[in-house]
Amino acid sequence: MRIIAGKAKGYSIIVPQGEVRPTQDRVREALFNILNPILPGARILDLFCGSGSVGLEALSRGAASVRMVDAARNSCAMARKNLEKSKLIGGSVVQSDCLQFVKRDAGKYDIIFADPPYAKAAGDRDMIAELMMDRLHELLTDDGYFIAEAQVGYGVGDIHTREFPGWELIDERTYGKNTILFYRKQS
C-alpha cells in the first residue's frame, strides 16, 4: 500500500495487523481523481481512518488539513507513524469512537470521508446511516461533501436506496466489492 500521487507519492503506508481493511489503491486513486478539483486547500475529516491512507493521500494532494479519527489504539498509532514518516503537514490523529466524536466536534469540513467496518451479518449496525442521522450535517460547509465507502450487496450496501433528510446522493461508484457514495448537504 502506498501514497499514489502528490508531495509524498510512493511513500509506503504501514498498515496495522488484524481487522483493518484499508481502502485499496485503485479505489483511492479513483476517489481522488474525482475529488481533485476541490481538494486543494480543503479541510477534511477522515472517520474510521485505520492506517490513515485516505487522509495521507488527501494531504499529499494538497488538502489544507485532515483530522483522522479511529477508536482503535493500534490504528491511531499507525496513522500517527505514517503521518510522521511521510513528513506531510496539516494532519492530526484523534483516538475516539467516531460516532461519539461527531456528536462533540465543533470543526467545519469541506469533505467528510467515512469507511466504517462492514456489516458481517444481518442486523449489524449501519454506521453510515447513524452518522447521517446525527449531526454530521452540521460539520460540513454549505457546499461540502460526505463520502462513504460501503460493501456492495450486504448490510449497508443498499444504503443508496434509502433517503436521508438533508442529504442528496449525487454519485455512486462501484469497484469490485466496494461502493463509494457521494452525498451533498441540502440547504
Which residue stretches match the model-derived regions?
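Class I S-adenosyl-L-methionine-dependent methyltransferase catalytic core
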Residues: 1-187
